Structure formats: C-alpha cells, structure tokens
Amino acid sequence: MRNLFAIVDRERADAATTSISLDARLGMLYNAALRLADIALRHCGYRAGHERQHYRVITSLPFTLGNDWKETTRFLERIQKLRHRNDYESVGLATKTQVDELGKIVEKLQTAVVDLVR
C-alpha cells in the first residue's frame, strides 16, 4: 500500500503545479482520489473487478469509510464523467472551482484513508 500512497502524493504534488492546465490538474486529483478509494477497498479485503473498475472503486467509499462519504461519492462520479470528456472529447472543461474543491476532497479523503489503515 505504500506504493499506492506514493502515487497519491505524486498526483497531489503534480496537481499543485499551476503552470499546467486545469484539465490536467483535475485528472491528477481524480487519480489521487481513485487510488485512495482503492486503498480503502483493499484494506477492507476487496478489489474491484475490471469491468467498470473506476465506478466500483469510487462507489465503495460509503462502504469502506461510512455513509458520510455518499455526497463525496456523487461528486467524484460527476468529476469522473468530466475527466472522461476532457480525455476523449474536449478540452478546457475543468474550472478552477472544481479543481480547488476536488483538491480539498482529496486532502480530506487521504486523512480518512490513512486513519483507516492505521
């Protein structure tokens, strides 16, 4: 799990670079959130299958961290769709507000996951 936490740290550090696009920063923060959700899922003894893996990992948060994470899960699902559009259909869709909000969520999520695995 140490390597997964290292990926999270790298993604968060890279996303803090303001000279890259908001789309790229959003993608990096989403990847960090996805890794954190995966760490929590693995800690609880599960792994998501390959089919709809991102969806399954993200939607596992209320089960691994508690029902307080339901709204965060919905937000991350919206971000996943936006990230998909940014990667495959368009550019310039991410806003600074979304990036900032996702950054705060990732910070909170990392704290919760670190507490879980202790």
PLM-predicted stretches and their roles:
Residues 1-118:
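Terminal alpha-helical segments
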